[in-house]
């Protein structure tokens, strides 16, 4: 992310250059950013991706034509992580599975600062609806869950990955098929318990 820095400087003999530095967390050392020509009074700083702090300062040191210098340091400001995690891939061990069987999912995900948590969702209608199957810490890179009932030709798994700043990244698996593995159910409705039927008479059976 770009951060705009601006300043005012003048000198009786003329200016030569401006040198920009930053420091974090009250460090004694300022880190060099860049140097610019004397006619400039602003700069767009590309903040390093891994830099996150509640106390950052900018220092500008200005040189004149006879090599005398002076500097000024900004007030403290914060740098927040605004970069979302990236899910490179969601890996399934199969392209076909039955209901009630266990599906193993693995993934590769990265973040500029660090990952915090992962949520795993399942859909059997090509992503129109999702069911949360599990939440876990980012130290894990695999998870298994039991496929719920429901035959499908367009099932998929979605991951939502969060970093420590609350930024989210998303990854979706390839579509896979879910086959029928649910036995039929039957319930006899009649005759009911305690019914007496005479020998040679008809007995009506019904069921659902």
Specify the residue positions occupied by each region the protein language model found:
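Short, solvent-exposed loop/linker segments at the N-terminal edge
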Residues: 1, 94-101, 194-201
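Surface-exposed, short loops/turns at beta-strand junctions within beta-sandwich domains
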Residues: 49-54, 149-153
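Proline-enriched interdomain boundary motifs that mark the N-terminal boundary
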Residues: 83-91, 182-190
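Conserved structural position at the C-terminal beta-strand
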Residues: 60-62, 159-161
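Short strand-edge motifs at loop-to-beta-strand transitions and within beta-strands
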Residues: 41-45, 141-145
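Solvent-exposed loop/turn segments flanking beta-strands in beta-repeat/beta-sandwich domains
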Residues: 11-21, 111-120
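Extracellular acidic, Ser/Thr/Pro-rich low-complexity tracts
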Residues: 6-13, 64, 81, 108-113, ...
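Conserved Ser/Thr-centered positions that define the repeating blades of beta-propeller domains
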Residues: 23, 123-124, 191
């Amino acid at each position: 992310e770009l951060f705009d820095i601006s300043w005012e400087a003048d000198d009786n003999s003329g200016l030569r250059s401006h040198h920009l530095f930053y420091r974090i967390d009250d460090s004694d050392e300022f880190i060099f950013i860049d140097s610019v020509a004397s006619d400039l009074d602003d700069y767009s700083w590309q903040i390093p991706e891994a830099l996150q702090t509640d106390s950052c300062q900018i220092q500008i040191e200005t040189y004149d034509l006879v090599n005398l210098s002076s500097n000024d340091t900004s007030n403290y400001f914060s740098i927040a992580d605004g970069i979302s995690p990236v899910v490179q891939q969601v890996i399934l061990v199969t392209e076909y599975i039955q209901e009630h069987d266990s599906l193993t999912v693995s993934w590769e995900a990265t973040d500029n600062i660090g990952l915090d948590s992962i949520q795993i969702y399942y859909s059997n209608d090509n992503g129109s609806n999702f069911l949360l199957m599990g939440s876990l810490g980012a130290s894990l890179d695999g998870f298994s869950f039991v496929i719920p009932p429901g035959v499908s030709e367009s099932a998929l798994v979605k991951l939502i990955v969060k970093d420590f700043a609350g930024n989210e990244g998303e990854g979706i698996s390839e579509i896979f098929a879910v086959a029928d593995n649910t036995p039929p159910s039957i319930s006899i409705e009649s005759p009911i318990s305690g019914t007496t039927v005479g020998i040679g008479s008809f007995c009506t059976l019904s069921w659902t």
